[in-house]
Amino acid sequence: SAAMGPNDSSLSTQVGGVDLTYKWKPLEHNTYKSFTWQSEIFYAKVQKTENIQVNSLGLYSLMSLQIAKRSFITARYNYAQDVNAPAAVLMAYSATYGWLATEFQKIELEGKMTEQPNHSQTYEAWLRWIFVIGTHGAHQY
């Protein structure tokens, strides 16, 4: 997809992106195994002044592997250039273990390392409880 239009400087900005997804499930035992690989890339071209144009890029790629009926592991990579300073790059790596407690609840444990544009690193750990309320695809109400 793509879009273009005027920006704050009354000049033009163009943005675009492409998303690719691959999903695999075996014909047999397909409630116990699956694999998804999803990647997306974004591009921005911003005309700041008549003489200054800034181009920036961002992307992510993730792979998710179902290792049991209710368990998944996921790895993700992020890359982003600052739209105002493309030399400033942020990169992040994460790994997640997810468990489907029920069809309405998912519990995830995630570790993430982010490398800031100044090359400092931050480390995070998250425990998430995701729950669904209301109408969903499994039941018609």
Stretch-by-stretch model annotation:
Residues E50-N51, S64-Q66, R70-K112, Y141:
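Outer membrane beta-barrel transmembrane domains
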Residues S1-T13, G17, Y60-Q66, S71-I73, ...:
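Glycine/serine-rich loop-strand microenvironments at binding/catalytic pocket rims
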Residues V18-L20, W99-A101, Q121-Y141:
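Outer-membrane beta-barrel "beta-signal"
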Residues V18, K33-S39, I73-A75, A95, ...:
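Transmembrane beta-strands of outer-membrane beta-barrel proteins
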Residues A2-P6, W24, I41-Q47, Y77-V83, ...:
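Transmembrane beta-strands of outer-membrane beta-barrel pores
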Residues S12-V18, Q53-L59, V89-Y93, Q121-A125:
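Residues that define the transmembrane beta-barrel architecture of outer-membrane proteins
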Residues P26-F35, R70, F104, T135-Y141:
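Short loop/turn motifs that connect adjacent beta-strands in outer-membrane beta-barrel proteins
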Residues S1-S56:
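Surface-exposed beta-loop-beta
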